[in-house]
Amino acid sequence: MRFDVRIDIDAIDFINSQTDKSRRIIEKNLKALKEDPFPGSRGDKELLNLRPGVTIYRLHIARMFTAFYEIEESTVFVNEVMTIEQAHKKYKGL
């Protein structure tokens, strides 16, 4: 099954603010969510247990960036993309 990937406008702004190389790396990893957005053996995707009824996934990208996303039926909604440092500051306990 292929998934449609939708990216929040703020996440797009962040991606566009990166260097060409970083932008290509981020885009490549986000496009890979079309094929398989669920956590697996690679360890780059993780289901976060925040609270009941909230299902958020985290994608580590090249040890430099983190994307947070949700999956609804056949659509992946990328809500945020940020540096790993920003993610650690914003989501300390995850």
Where on the chain are the PLM-derived regions?
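A short, surface-exposed loop/turn module that caps and links secondary-structure elements
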Residues: 32-59
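Extreme N-terminus of proteins, especially the signal/transit-peptide cleavage junction
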Residues: 1-3, 53, 94
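Enriched for short, Lys/Arg-rich terminal
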Residues: 13, 24, 61-94
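Generic surface-pattern signal
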Residues: 20, 31, 35-38, 92-93
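Arg/Lys-rich, positively charged N-terminal/basic patches that mediate binding to nucleic acids
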Residues: 1-31
